[in-house]
Amino acid sequence: MQFSTTPTLEGLTIVEYCGVVTGEAILGANIFRDFFAGIRDIVGGRSGAYEKELRKAREIAFEELGSQARALGADAVVGIDIDYETVGQNGSMLMVSVSGTAVKTRR
């Protein structure tokens, strides 16, 4: 499965548009990580805990996106948009959503 934020794939021709596909992941953030991440932010450091959670959420969302595309018989997803949001009380959860168009391609 190929993923692209562009509307085309170099070297491939889109032969069929299969439909819009989406993937979402919502992960809760641990209160202690939140506290220490806040301290790191104050002193200008990076928050490894948040970065790890963000990567994990993005991977889950892309797995879901690919699964939906495969179910439609597609071999690629183009025009992908990635959105990040904090949700829940006081932004206690992280949501990553991805969407794109599932397509069938040929060389």
From Swiss-Prot:
It comes from the Bacteria. Pfam families: YbjQ_1. Gene3D superfamilies: Hypothetical protein apc22750. Chain B. InterPro entries: UPF0145_dom_sf, UPF0145_YbjQ-like. Disulfide bonds: none annotated. Belongs to the UPF0145 family. This is UPF0145 protein YbjQ. It comes from Shigella flexneri.
